[in-house]
Amino acid sequence: MERMLFLSPPSLAAHPEKLSTILSAHAQYSTELQMLDRLAAGLVSLPESTYDIVMFLIDADCLKTGSTPRMSRGVIESIVRALRPGGKLKSEHGLFASPDYPDRTELVLAGLVFDDNGDLVKPNFGAQDTVPLKLGKKKKATPAASSGDGAEANGVTVNMPIATDSKRNGQGAAVQGLGFVDFSDDLDLPPEDDDELIDEEALMDEEDMGRPIVQPPECRPKAGKRRRACKDCTCGLAERLHEEDTAKRANADAALETLKLGSNDLAEVDFTVQGKMGSCGNCALGDAFRCDGCPYIGLPPFKPGEEVRLLSNDVQL
């Protein structure tokens, strides 16, 4: 038994006798009733691909006043999903068939089409068959029977008109017959290989390979910025940038190594080393340290390996 869904506007809910009359008139169907406002508010949901017919009820008072009930886009999509393939969406009084119906475009955009009766039908795309398209292949040449008044060329026989006495007398000659050309025949042309591949390297010679690549100005990197490599770089730019970054990092690491002083760098640090002088060049040249600000000022020159102690109560002159 086919299933039928009735969508009633809220105005019909106040007239239960009208709803009973409508339901009894369609007793041959398995009927269900839903209120349009509850469906629009999302309080109820319709099962998918269930109903063969969805009937949109209209209150007669609304038609008299000219207030046509509207359906939102969400309600229309719910109705289309609830219809089975090939199911119909009908309305009382032929409302959907009227070109002045405001939701006519929305119904068509939802995937419904009009039939000859003005009802909306959900297309059954599953019933459509897929027809493969095949390319024509070379056919074997068959000997064509030719009459004495015909000419044969490339396996196609064309009957030629024969001049008669009536034509010589100025009267039109009756055409004996015309040959039909089979356009699906390849006329013994060599078959085409659809799988033939073209070698890209064969399209360029040595002169083309030696030409420099001209980079458009819009593709050049801006001043102070270097060009970035693509994510799937295949031109070698990513490897070159990686090598440059590795070299820069190695140079930076070498510059940040721990400072190491050799024996020739201890002139300012240890004055007990024999033959070493301070930056002023006066240390150990005389009999005492004389530089202003030197912590050893006034002391005699130190001997190599001598331990020097400065007491806080010593007066430095």
Curated annotation (Swiss-Prot):
Q: Does the keyword Cytoplasm apply?
A: yes
Fe-S binding site A: annotated span: 219-235
Which cysteines are cross-linked by disulfides?
Answer: none
Name the segments for region: Fe-S binding site B. Answer: 280-294
| Residue positions of motif Cx2C motif 2 | 291-294
User: Taxonomically, which superkingdom?
Assistant: Eukaryota
Q: Molecular function (GO) terms listed?
A: 2 iron, 2 sulfur cluster binding; 4 iron, 4 sulfur cluster binding; electron transfer activity; metal ion binding
Q: Which GO terms describe its biological process?
A: iron-sulfur cluster assembly
Sorted keywords for this record are: 2Fe-2S, 4Fe-4S, Cytoplasm, Iron, Iron-sulfur, Metal-binding, Mitochondrion
Q: Which residues bind [2Fe-2S] cluster?
A: C219, C230, C233, C235
InterPro entries on file: Anamorsin, CIAPIN1, Dre2_N
Region annotation (Linker) ranges: 132-209
Q: Does the keyword 4Fe-4S apply?
A: yes
Q: Name one GO cellular component term.
A: mitochondrial intermembrane space
Motif Cx2C motif 1, per the record, lies over: 280-283
Q: Where does [4Fe-4S] cluster bind?
A: C280, C283, C291, C294
**Cofactor(s) this protein requires:** [2Fe-2S] cluster; [4Fe-4S] cluster
Q: Where in the cell is it found?
A: Cytoplasm; Mitochondrion intermembrane space
Where are the residues of the annotated region N-terminal SAM-like domain?
1-131
Q: Of which family is this protein a member? A: Belongs to the anamorsin family.
Instruction: State the function annotated in the UniProt record.
Output: Component of the cytosolic iron-sulfur (Fe-S) protein assembly (CIA) machinery required for the maturation of extramitochondrial Fe-S proteins. Part of an electron transfer chain functioning in an early step of cytosolic Fe-S biogenesis, facilitating the de novo assembly of a [4Fe-4S] cluster on the scaffold complex CFD1-NBP35. Electrons are transferred to DRE2 from NADPH via the FAD- and FMN-containing protein TAH18.
Domain statement: The C-terminal domain binds 2 Fe-S clusters but is otherwise mostly in an intrinsically disordered conformation. The N-terminal domain has structural similarity with S-adenosyl-L-methionine-dependent methyltransferases, but does not bind S-adenosyl-L-methionine. It is required for correct assembly of the 2 Fe-S clusters.
Share what the entry says about its subunit structure, partners included: Monomer. Interacts with TAH18. Interacts with MIA40.
What is this protein called in UniProt? Fe-S cluster assembly protein DRE2
Q: Which organism is it from?
A: Uncinocarpus reesii (strain UAMH 1704)
